[in-house]
Amino acid sequence: MNVLIAGAGALGSLIGARLSKTRASISLFSTNREHMEAIRRGGLDIEELDGTVRNYPLKTFFEADKLPRNPDLVLVLVKTYATQTALSLVHGVCSASTVFLTLQNGIGNWERIAEIAGKEAVLAGSTAQGSTLLGPGLIRHGGNGPTYIGEPEGPASERARRLVELFREAELVAEPSDEVARLIWEKLVINVGINAITGLTGIRNGFIAEMPEATDLCRSAVEEAIIVAGSKGFPFGVEMVQRVISVARATGRNRSSMGQDVDKKKKTEIDAINGAVVRFGKEAGIPTPVNETLTSLMKVLEAQYTSQRTP
């Protein structure tokens, strides 16, 4: 199986490296030329959970016109706001039989992919793996967690089960799912309680479980998201709050993806996470003051480091 990782940042590089130990042929694609060239020259170094460093030789690409043609699978892990741009770049090298699997954060990604590739070509899922990009060619595995794969709508198909087996062959915990839409909302609720808080404060995920003030803020944001998710047909109980805190603890060494974006002064996925809760809340008449505040603060922070204007 030929697999193209579209969006080989911290998480994409981690999953690509793990999959490279299977029967599959893996290609990493990212516009981060420095990271791609470092891996091409010396392989990808992963600082493992036990502190050891393992090296993975991998094929890398930073130019779309150099990509290998006719991949069997495109694993989409770009930022939500870059989904359509990335698909327009890779779609030209794909065949009618290419399958696209999104494990991205946020809501609406599989629909965006389907607009370009067709709904029948898309699988979706959720992963709790955590990874931090430490520098070109170097990542830290920040936490283990399951990956769920299935059809965007309906029960898990045979093709989804085949990909689950591939992930298991790579020693990644994976399960087929008949409820992908619910899992995507569940991941959204988890991200709501972790990403913006870590991005705004500079802390690692684990501090959310250790600092009472951070825990309380996480709880308030998640409680709003639970109510909004229920209005969309995905009811979660109050135990979801403790689940989010447990995820923060399990990925304690990790900086969330949003935290890493802030560290690098890059655009974040705030609109697809806390901002999505705010939008859906307004549609349903549900107040979301904590998520509104987190969203606004993140936008102010982004504007500070992305704007070319001076006060």
Which residues make up each language-model segment?
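Short, well-ordered alpha-helices that flank and scaffold nucleotide-derived cofactor binding pockets
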Residues: 17, 21, 88-92, 115, ...
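Rossmann-like NAD(P)(H) cofactor-binding subdomain of soluble oxidoreductases
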Residues: 53-138
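Internal alpha-helical scaffold of NAD(P)-dependent oxidoreductase catalytic cores
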Residues: 92-93, 115-121, 134-187, 197-238
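NAD(P)+-binding Rossmann beta1-loop-alpha1 motif at the extreme N-terminus of oxidoreductases
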Residues: 1-52
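NAD(P)-dependent Rossmann-like dehydrogenase/reductase catalytic/cofactor-binding core
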Residues: 158, 168-169, 219-311
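Short alpha-helical
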Residues: 34, 81-82, 107-108, 155, ...
